[in-house]
Amino acid sequence: MDSIVSAASVIAAGLAVGLAAIGPGIGQGSAAANAVEGIARQPEVEGKIRGTLLLSLAFMESLTIYGLVVALSLLFANPYVG
C-alpha cells in the first residue's frame, strides 16, 4: 500500500507542475503579444504598458509557483506516506 501511495504522489506531483505551467504559459504569451502590439500602436504609452505587463506577468507566474508548492508538498510532506 505504501508503494502505491508513493507512486501516486510522484505522478500527482508531475501533473501538478505540468498543468500549473500550461495556463500561465499561454496567458503570458498572449499578454506579451498584446503588450507589444499596444506599444507598436502607441509608442508614447510604452512605460505604462510595460509596467502593467510586468505586474500581470508576476501574478500569472504566481500560479505556477503554487503548483510547484503543491508538487513539493506531495513529494516531501505527504501525510499519507508512513
Curated annotation (Swiss-Prot):
Checking InterPro entries in the record gives:
ATP_synth_csu_bac/chlpt (IPR005953), ATP_synth_F0_csu (IPR000454), ATP_synth_F0_csu_DDCD_BS (IPR020537), ATP_synth_F0_csu_sf (IPR038662), ATPase_proteolipid_c-like_dom (IPR002379), F/V-ATP_Csub_sf (IPR035921)
The record's annotation in PROSITE patterns points to: ATPASE_C (PS00605)
Which Pfam family is one of this chain's hits? ATP-synt_C
Q: Can you provide one Gene Ontology molecular function annotated for this UniProt record?
A: lipid binding
What cellular component terms from Gene Ontology apply here? chloroplast thylakoid membrane; proton-transporting ATP synthase complex; proton-transporting two-sector ATPase complex, proton-transporting domain
Site positions (Reversibly protonated during proton transport) are E61
Q: What is this entry's stated membrane topology? A: Multi-pass membrane protein
- Asked if the Swiss-Prot or TrEMBL record annotates the protein with the keyword Hydrolase, the reply is no
The UniProt keyword set, sorted, is: ATP synthesis, CF(0), Chloroplast, Hydrogen ion transport, Ion transport, Lipid-binding, Membrane, Plastid, Thylakoid, Transmembrane, Transmembrane helix, Transport
Q: Write out the annotated subcellular location.
A: Plastid, Chloroplast thylakoid membrane
> May I ask which residue range the UniProt record assigns to the signal sequence?
none
Q: What does this protein do?
A: F(1)F(0) ATP synthase produces ATP from ADP in the presence of a proton or sodium gradient. F-type ATPases consist of two structural domains, F(1) containing the extramembraneous catalytic core and F(0) containing the membrane proton channel, linked together by a central stalk and a peripheral stalk. During catalysis, ATP synthesis in the catalytic domain of F(1) is coupled via a rotary mechanism of the central stalk subunits to proton translocation.
Q: What else does the entry mention about this protein?
A: In plastids the F-type ATPase is also known as CF(1)CF(0).
Q: How does it assemble?
A: F-type ATPases have 2 components, F(1) - the catalytic core - and F(0) - the membrane proton channel. F(1) has five subunits: alpha(3), beta(3), gamma(1), delta(1), epsilon(1). F(0) has four main subunits: a(1), b(1), b'(1) and c(10-14). The alpha and beta chains form an alternating ring which encloses part of the gamma chain. F(1) is attached to F(0) by a central stalk formed by the gamma and epsilon chains, while a peripheral stalk is formed by the delta, b and b' chains.
The Swiss-Prot or TrEMBL record describes its family as follows:
Belongs to the ATPase C chain family.
Q: What is this protein called?
A: ATP synthase subunit c, chloroplastic
Q: Which organism is it from?
A: Porphyra purpurea (Red seaweed)
What taxonomic classification does the UniProt entry list for its organism? Eukaryota, Rhodophyta, Bangiophyceae, Bangiales, Bangiaceae
Gene symbol of the encoding locus: atpH
